[in-house]
Amino acid sequence: MIKEGIVTVLLTTSLGDIKIELNKELAPITTQNFVKYIESGFYDQTIFHRVIENFVIQGGGHNEDMSMKDRDLEPIQNEANNGLKNERGSIAMARTAEPHSASSQFFINLQNNFTLNHTSETSRGWGYAVFGKVSEGMDVVDKIAMTETGVFPPHTDVPVEPILILKAAVVE
């Protein structure tokens, strides 16, 4: 069944499948950006490079050797003021300290992380833009969250055994 205003994507990972429903009505810029990266094959063969138990799993920017992937698209406008919340199972855009710097990296919340929500349109209050939620495969997300991590300078919380996004695809 196709839901109005929803784009469904499938992340095929080395630990199983994660199906995500993107909210193109409340997060149109972010959804379009994510879909462009998927359609270009950008996420294929990337890793979840940051795994913090009881917080987030993050991916979308590193190769298996931890080198950064070259991004083709410009950073996007932060849509964290869209009313969607950083709650368990939601997907949001990672960014730098600059509120409008999100590009390809994303994270899935492992718990309700309401401190990441939008509170004001200031550098400290912008928050992290939620643009969808896991609809199937939260068990896979939890399996990723339980993986052993270590340090890969300058990064911490890197899975000791790489967890790959083998393929990302838009599905209907």
Predicted regions and their residues:
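Cyclophilin-like peptidyl-prolyl cis-trans isomerases
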Residues: 1-172
